[in-house]
A protein has these predicted regions:
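Structural preference for solvent-exposed beta-strand-turn elements
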Residues: 1-376
Length: 376
């Protein structure tokens, strides 16, 4: 294998695929990145794969001799990133050898790799017709829901985001058992096929990161087959296992009607919560929200035993009887930050039943939070 490529492009590509390299590999080759040079296409392909998440990208290169080898991702990335950006890099490896030489204007480095045949095959599962997704719509769906997925591996299915596609659009949903975020998106796909799959949050965080930094507006092709999902666009591929099982019927958790509704300024509520959260963090992360229909106010308070207490009040349009309800402040803050509207609606029935927060001017996003029971 012998090729010449741009230092900047190689360094950038290595940073992308290294995010799929195993931090604690079960086999030495999983700590490596696979390099595949093709003289026919004039491309250098890089692949990182930890047996769960795989990322593949390619860059243009002047390939004199085709070939493939794996190199230690961390060491290779650190060497390349420190090479002069204004000088091309030459990579060369003799047939049958595991020694790779990197050469630039600043000098040369030798690295020992492992055979490409030792690297596990990336499960691309690209059979059938792909589902075409609008990348901007997909990014919006992921940003609105990823934060609500569970970090508890014991809740296997809840550690992912559920993606559902039908003739009405794409629906992204995530829940950790304490809160639920759902975003319904129209005109998400040019395909007529339906989709019903749950993908690990870690994989989708990397997908959102990659799509956000992409150039161009190519549609994302989604393949789903035999426990694998593959997202492909431009010269990049992300593959992930899907999560087994039937995702909870989250729609039945959302109340059909509400006896109490409040409308408040989102940024005002967010700021007040962040200030009161300083005290809530000292104890149990619980804040109490109390509505006052007569005064047209919503008060936010926290009481940290043996530390102190604090409260603030903001203006609110209140309908229904007064109510006091308690939440984990982090859940409410994260939900409000996922919204972009000026006004937010808070809808509830009783201090112990689910509360729904939604943007005043956007019915596509629903955020449900379970309250915390407090002793009076």
């Amino acid at each position: 294998m012998k090729l010449v490529c741009s230092q900047a492009e190689l360094s950038s590509s290595l940073q992308l695929v290294s995010r799929a390299v195993a931090a604690r590999p079960t086999h030495p080759v999983l700590a490596n990145v696979l390099l595949t040079a093709d003289a026919g296409t004039g491309r250098l392909s890089l692949t990182g794969f930890d047996l769960s998440l795989g990322i593949q990208t390619s860059l243009g290169a002047s390939v004199a001799t085709s070939g493939a080898i794996t190199l230690p991702a961390r060491l290779f990335g650190e060497i390349v990133s420190r090479m002069p950006s204004d000088s091309p890099i030459t990579l060369s490896c003799e047939d049958g050898s595991e020694q790779v030489e990197l050469t630039s204007v600043s000098g040369s480095y030798q690295m020992r790799g492992m055979p490409a045949d030792d690297f596990p095959e990336l499960p691309l599962a690209q059979a059938g017709t792909p589902i075409k997704l609008d990348p901007d719509v997909l990014i919006k769906g992921l940003r609105a829901t990823l934060f609500a997925s569970s970090g508890d591996e014991a809740k296997q299915l809840l550690t992912g985001v559920h993606l559902g596609l039908d003739q009405n659009g794409l629906e992204c949903a995530a829940t950790d058992g304490h809160r639920l975020a759902v975003l319904r998106l129209q005109n998400a796909s040019s395909s007529e096929a339906d989709l019903d799959v749950t993908v690990p949050a870690r994989s989708l965080r990397e997908l959102e990161r990659l799509l956000s930094s992409r150039g161009g507006s190519d549609a994302v092709s989604l393949f789903c087959d035999r426990g694998q999902v593959v997202f492909q666009w431009a010269d990049q591929v992300l593959t992930s296992r899907s999560l087994d099982g039937t995702y909870p019927n989250y729609r039945q958790l959302i109340p059909e009607s509400f006896g109490r509704q409040l409308q408040v300024d989102r940024k005002g509520l967010l700021s007040a919560l962040e200030r009161v959260a300083v005290l809530a963090d000292q104890h149990n992360n619980v804040v109490k929200l109390t509505s006052d229909p007569a005064a047209g106010q919503l008060s936010i308070s926290a009481d940290a035993q043996d530390v102190g207490s604090g409260s603030e009040a903001i203006g609110a349009q209140v309908s229904g009887d007064a109510i006091q309800i308690a939440f984990n402040v982090r859940y409410v803050l994260e939900g409000l930050k996922a919204m972009g509207s000026e006004q937010v609606q808070l809808q509830c029935n009783a201090p112990t039943t689910p509360v729904v927060l939604a943007p005043q001017d956007d019915s596509s996003f629903t955020y449900l939070v379970m309250p915390v029971q407090i002793r009076q």
